[in-house]
């Protein structure tokens, strides 16, 4: 009797594509989030490079005074930037096909919107891809949660702030000096240095740097030597080894005596959670602060808070900051308006005659 064995029907093309996309054996994991991440980030990066090199000047304030941002129009690496979309466009969605010509699209700063929207989609998908890969490998999801902090910060300055201010022209320019200009104008208009959420962000970033340096130096100083004196201590580590590579008891004892006992972690898991949570929470708060100041819920104002018995103002640092803010405000967009809002709101004295 002869048995006939039929070959199992091969998986469909779509099935093989799905298996390849979700395979953790690839050198670089793609994932379903990666299907959207790759084209959006490639688009944002390509347009950024081309525009940074060759984009013509942009009428950022909508007053027919174009501002140059590209290298071919007189800028260098420090001064160059992708100039934000014109105030004449406001918050309108402005793809190339909405303009009468490519020249008009470039003049009104269309590349900025294109780059920012693709970039935000891309980094959000990168965060989703981190979660997806963690899920496939049976890991916990906290890598994606930590990455949500810079994603929130980027979304705040590139999307939420322009929405609150009513125009993409108020978004952060994509360049070094453009970033500093954004920071200075933000301080002038919103007094961000006096906002508690910004203070928490400063503590998060500087504190995170301090804790990272402390942790790295403590671990490096308490390695368990597996090599001779003639070899680097780093050569004594084998990838995937089960043994501890450093003596946490020695590190705990050192730091506990340097400061005091309870300033030092004796639990490695608690320590690493703290190292991750401190900067992440700080940056979350800063992003939240930017998002509230976008709608003009600004930093604290203690101007002229201290007076003497005669009612005369005794200047404090709050008043110094206020004068600096006014100076910065009158300098920016100097041709777009005659006076900044603070000065324009002052009642004009009446004259007889």
Swiss-Prot record:
Site residues, Cleavage: 344-345
Under SUPFAM superfamilies, the record lists:
Bacterial photosystem II reaction centre, L and M subunits (SSF81483)
- Protein residues bound to chlorophyll a PD1: 198
Q: Where is this protein chiefly located? A: plastid
**Keyword field:** Acetylation, Calcium, Chlorophyll, Chloroplast, Chromophore, Electron transport, Herbicide resistance, Iron, Magnesium, Manganese, Membrane, Metal-binding, Oxidoreductase, Phosphoprotein, Photosynthesis, Photosystem II, Plastid, Thylakoid, Transmembrane, Transmembrane helix, Transport
Task: Enumerate the residues marked as the site Tyrosine radical intermediate.
Answer: 161
What's a Pfam family this protein contains?
Photo_RC
Paste the cofactor note.
The D1/D2 heterodimer binds P680, chlorophylls that are the primary electron donor of PSII, and subsequent electron acceptors. It shares a non-heme iron and each subunit binds pheophytin, quinone, additional chlorophylls, carotenoids and lipids. D1 provides most of the ligands for the Mn4-Ca-O5 cluster of the oxygen-evolving complex (OEC). There is also a Cl(-1) ion associated with D1 and D2, which is required for oxygen evolution. The PSII complex binds additional chlorophylls, carotenoids and specific lipids.
GO terms assigned for molecular function: chlorophyll binding; electron transporter, transferring electrons within the cyclic electron transport pathway of photosynthesis activity; iron ion binding; oxidoreductase activity, acting on diphenols and related substances as donors, oxygen as acceptor; oxygen evolving activity
List the subcellular locations.
Plastid, Chloroplast thylakoid membrane
Tell me the InterPro entries matching this sequence. D1/D2, Photo_II_D1/D2_sf, Photo_RC_L/M, Photo_RC_L/M_CS, PSII_D1
This entry's Enzyme Commission designation comes to 1.10.3.9
* Protein name, UniProt field: Photosystem II protein D1
Q: Which residues bind chlorophyll a ChlzD1?
A: 118
The record describes its quaternary structure and partners as:
PSII is composed of 1 copy each of membrane proteins PsbA, PsbB, PsbC, PsbD, PsbE, PsbF, PsbH, PsbI, PsbJ, PsbK, PsbL, PsbM, PsbT, PsbX, PsbY, PsbZ, Psb30/Ycf12, at least 3 peripheral proteins of the oxygen-evolving complex and a large number of cofactors. It forms dimeric complexes.
Q: Which residues bind pheophytin a?
A: 126
- Coiled-coil annotation reads none
Lineage, please?
Eukaryota, Viridiplantae, Streptophyta, Embryophyta, Tracheophyta
| Residue numbers of N-acetylthreonine PTMs | 2
| GO biological process per UniProt | photosynthetic electron transport in photosystem II; response to herbicide
List the catalysed reactions.
Answer: 2 a plastoquinone + 4 hnu + 2 H2O = 2 a plastoquinol + O2
> Which organism is this protein's natural source?
Calycanthus floridus var. glaucus
Modification Phosphothreonine occurs at? 2
Q: Which residues cross the membrane?
A: 29-46, 118-133, 142-156, 197-218, 274-288
What does the UniProt function comment say about this protein?
Photosystem II (PSII) is a light-driven water:plastoquinone oxidoreductase that uses light energy to abstract electrons from H(2)O, generating O(2) and a proton gradient subsequently used for ATP formation. It consists of a core antenna complex that captures photons, and an electron transfer chain that converts photonic excitation into a charge separation. The D1/D2 (PsbA/PsbD) reaction center heterodimer binds P680, the primary electron donor of PSII as well as several subsequent electron acceptors.
């Amino acid at each position: 009797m002869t048995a006939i064995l039929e070959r199992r029907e091969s998986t469909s093309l779509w099935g093989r594509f799905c298996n390849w996309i979700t395979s953790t054996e690839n050198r670089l994991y793609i994932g379903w989030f990666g299907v959207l991440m790759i084209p959006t980030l490639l688009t944002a990066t390509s347009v950024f490079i081309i525009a940074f090199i060759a984009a013509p000047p942009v009428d950022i304030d909508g007053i027919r005074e174009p501002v140059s941002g590209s290298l071919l129009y007189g800028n260098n690496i420090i001064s160059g930037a992708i100039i934000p979309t014109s105030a004449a466009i406001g918050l309108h969605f402005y793809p190339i096909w909405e303009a009468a010509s490519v020249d008009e699209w470039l003049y009104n700063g269309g590349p900025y919107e294109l780059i920012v929207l693709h970039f935000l989609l891309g980094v959000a998908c990168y965060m989703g891809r981190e979660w997806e890969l963690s899920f496939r490998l049976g890991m916990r999801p906290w890598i994606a949660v930590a990455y949500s902090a810079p994603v929130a910060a980027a979304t705040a300055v590139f999307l939420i702030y322009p929405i609150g201010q009513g125009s993409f022209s108020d978004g952060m320019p994509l360049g070094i000096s453009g970033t500093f200009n954004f920071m200075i104008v933000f301080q002038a208009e919103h007094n961000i240095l006096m906002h508690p959420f910004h203070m928490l962000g400063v503590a998060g970033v500087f504190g995170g740097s301090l804790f990272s340096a402390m942790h790295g130096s403590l671990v490096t100083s308490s390695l368990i030597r597996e090599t001779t004196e003639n070899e680097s201590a780093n050569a004594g580590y084998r990838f995937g080894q089960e043994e501890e590579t450093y003596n946490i008891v020695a590190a705990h004892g050192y730091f506990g005596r340097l400061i005091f006992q309870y300033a030092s972690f004796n639990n490695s898991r608690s320590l690493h959670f703290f190292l991750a949570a401190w900067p992440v929470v700080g940056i979350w708060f800063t992003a939240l602060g930017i998002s509230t100041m976008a709608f003009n819920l600004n930093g604290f104002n203690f101007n002229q808070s201290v007076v003497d018995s005669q009612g005369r103002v005794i200047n404090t640092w709050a008043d110094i900051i206020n004068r600096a803010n006014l100076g910065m405000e009158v300098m920016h967009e100097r041709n777009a308006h005659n006076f900044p809002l603070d000065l324009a709101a002052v009642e004009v004295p009446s004259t007889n005659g």
